[in-house]
Regions:
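Outer membrane beta-barrel transmembrane domains
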Residues: 178-179, 183-187, 193-195, 207, ...
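Outer membrane beta-barrel translocator domains of Type V secretion systems
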Residues: 109-271, 281-282
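Secreted peptidase-domain scaffold signal
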Residues: 43-132
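Caspase-like cysteine protease fold
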Residues: 27-50
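Outer-membrane beta-barrel "beta-signal"
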Residues: 313, 396-408
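Hydrolase catalytic cores
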Residues: 1-33
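Hydrophobic alpha-helix feature that most strongly marks membrane-spanning transmembrane helices
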Residues: 22, 270-272, 312, 375, ...
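Surface-exposed loop and membrane-interface regions of Gram-negative outer-membrane beta-barrel proteins
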Residues: 390-392
């Protein structure tokens, strides 16, 4: 190293050591620093006004103001994104560079088996419409107590002509399941509740349902068809407000919502006394809004599936199911990531990063349940579920169980 450069570097080091020295008394020989004690630990830290560090942390917080959801991989996606946008290089007043990380990184929403409302508000058997309870050709569960319980599902059925049946309902779960595993949309929003109408005749059936989640962020409409051969098709339209498949951000990200179309093929068949139901779902999502901080490049493609078997057992009905919630298969996006920040001038440099937010693993849920009517006016349900690679995160697991006793 040339002597001149060595002298300049030694002078800079001396300046830093003197500026960061601990004042230990009244001024002595040196009228400025007095009797001081060198503080090497402090000298090794970035030196700038306290407000500069607050400003730098605010910059990182703005870039990290994202909350991921289960379809994107939950906590695994949050960790990966934090590595991209949760840190940067800062320069202090002496031109030295340091690495700084955000005080709050990218967060992940809960997506466990108890997230949302997995236990759909199904109607008890004694409240379901029965043909023998028909009044003027109608069968209904709407009675004198319905006015006192406006949140209870109400169903009315009637037969317009022989061999056909029409069912109308309100306060019913839309797109949900009967157990802990719930619907394919678990982890995106709470279970939508709304109205439904269905028609069936000779093995053919058609249905239409529409509902809104409790927080008002999600509205789902479902049209379903089924044939006598057991094959069926469901088309769903999912409108989200302020989120995209459950992913949320603050105003700076500009995610105003998303629109998802889901197509589900269903197959039902009874084999050796076991009622089998299989479902395979494909989805396409268009994100609305966005900003230079986060912009999706094209549609988000996802998939889900479930397989369930049910049969009479021990005087009740036992179910065993294997399912996987909605998982994003392709989600290409462009992120704006911070690179460096000058603590003195406030100058910020950034770079664009292309990422695919699709997770590498898939959650599998195994569920066992059993239910029986204890009497004409009481129902008992019990179930347990185990999630492997929960939230589409490798090695993560979740276990949940429920016991329900309903007495009228």
């Amino acid at each position: 190293m040339p002597p001149r450069r060595s002298r300049e570097r030694l002078k800079a080091i001396s300046r830093i050591l003197l500026d960061t020295a601990t004042d230990a008394g009244a001024p002595g020989v040196d009228a400025v620093y007095g009797a001081g004690i060198l503080n090497v630990e402090k000298a090794m830290q970035a030196q700038a006004p306290a407000s500069s560090f607050v400003a730098a942390d605010a910059v990182l917080t703005r870039f990290s103001s994202l909350t991921t959801s289960a379809p994107f991989g939950g906590s695994a996606a949050a960790a990966a994104l934090s590595g991209q946008v949760g840190g940067m290089t800062v320069f202090d007043r002496y031109g030295r560079d340091f690495t700084m990380t955000a005080s709050t990184g990218v967060r992940a929403r809960s997506s466990g088996l108890l997230a949302g409302a997995m236990l759909a508000p199904t109607d008890a058997p004694w409240r379901a419409a029965q043909a023998e309870a028909a009044r003027f050709g109608f069968a209904t569960n709407v009675g004198a107590q319905a006015m006192r319980r406006p949140d209870v599902p109400a169903v009315v059925s009637f037969s317009p002509v022989a061999g056909q049946q029409v069912t109308l309902g309100t306060n019913v779960a839309v797109g949900g399941g009967n157990g802990l595993a719930g619907s394919a949309l678990r982890g995106i929003a709470s279970l939508p509740v709304g109205g439904m109408s269905a028609w069936s005749a000779g093995g053919w059936s058609a249905s239409l349902s529409s509902g809104t989640s409790r927080d008002g962020r999600l509205r789902q409409q479902v049209i379903g068809f089924a044939t006598p051969l057991g094959f069926g098709l469901e088309l769903s339209d999912l409108a989200e407000r302020g989120q995209v498949l459950g992913m949320r951000g603050d105003a700076a990200l500009g995610l105003s919502g998303g629109r998802t179309t889901l197509a589900t093929l269903t197959y039902r068949r009874t084999l050796v006394g076991v009622d089998l139901t299989a479902r395979a779902t494909a989805s396409s999502t268009r994100a609305h809004g966005g900003s230079n901080l986060l912009r999706f490049d094209g549609p988000l493609i996802g998939s889900a599936f479930s397989l369930e078997g049910a049969r009479e057992l021990f005087g009740g009905r036992a179910t065993l199911g294997l399912s996987s919630t909605l998982r994003v298969e392709r989600a290409r996006a462009v992120l704006l990531a911070p690179v460096s920040f000058d603590l003195v001038t406030g100058a910020l440099s950034t770079r664009a990063v292309a990422v695919d937010l699709a997770p590498n693993d898939r959650e599998l849920d195994l569920e066992l349940g059993w239910s029986t009517a204890l009497s004409r006016t009481s129902l008992f349900r019990v179930g347990i579920a185990r999630a492997f690679d929960a939230g589409h995160v490798a090695g993560a697991s979740d276990t949940a169980a429920f016991v329900t006793i309903a007495i009228r």
